[in-house]
Amino acid sequence: MARYLGPKLKLSRREGTDLFLKSGVRAIESKCKIDNAPGVHGARKPRLSDYGLQLREKQKVRRMYGVLEKQFRNYYKESARLQGNTGENLLQLLEGRLDNVVYRMGFGATRAESRQLVSHKAVLVNGKVVNIPSFNVKASDVIAIREKAKKQSRIGAALEIAGQREVPTWVSVDATKMEGIFTRQPERSDLSAEINEQLIIELYSK
């Protein structure tokens, strides 16, 4: 599946936030001023219309989870079909992606690295190899690193970084065995307050 291959820090500067969570690996400020827009001196950010705010929020979340436009729209359509709050459904679908769950469990330092682990067949779901980053993980699914991949230094480094932050309450992880359980779907209160999913729903509802 296609994915964005351009400069990621530029996207983070455009959205004004660390989209790819590289600050967990190294200080992103050491590479660029995250609060400044792209450009030699950082272009002045214009005041946005309601539509502009909605579009920026959609782009921010889409890029954060590494999803292209068509797939992101499909996630919205699916979330609208499900019972309950559409915005919360959308975030749960994104959080349930295998590459994201691998990241949440700490096996990858970033979502991009976690996606690569999945694509390179380093991840097992309930004992079977799954190499589709968008695979939908369900409650009680067991996620593990394949035996022959456990010696990869980047996985050990990622787990070391993950050990410095709080493990999400909706997963349980055994770092020694390099496996974890997706215990439940995250609730809205579990997720980042920096995301305003209502703006995305308003955008797609037009």
From Swiss-Prot:
Pfam family, one: Ribosomal_S4
Keyword rRNA-binding set for record: yes
Superkingdom of the source species: Bacteria
InterPro entries xref list: Ribosomal_uS4, Ribosomal_uS4_bac-type, Ribosomal_uS4_CS, Ribosomal_uS4_N, S4_RNA-bd, S4_RNA-bd_sf
GO (cellular component) term, any one: small ribosomal subunit
Keywords per UniProt: Ribonucleoprotein, Ribosomal protein, RNA-binding, rRNA-binding
Molecular function in Gene Ontology: rRNA binding; structural constituent of ribosome
GO annotation, biological process: ribosomal small subunit biogenesis; translation
All copies of domain S4 RNA-binding, residue ranges: 96-156
Matching Gene3D superfamilies: Ribosomal Protein S4 Delta 41, Chain A, domain 1, RNA-binding S4 domain
Keyword RNA-binding set for record: yes
Family stated for the protein in its record: Belongs to the universal ribosomal protein uS4 family.
Function: One of the primary rRNA binding proteins, it binds directly to 16S rRNA where it nucleates assembly of the body of the 30S subunit.
NCBIfam families, sorted: PRK05327.1, rpsD_bact
Subunit structure: Part of the 30S ribosomal subunit. Contacts protein S5. The interaction surface between S4 and S5 is involved in control of translational fidelity.
Name under which the protein is recorded: Small ribosomal subunit protein uS4B
Species of the source: Psychromonas ingrahamii (strain DSM 17664 / CCUG 51855 / 37)
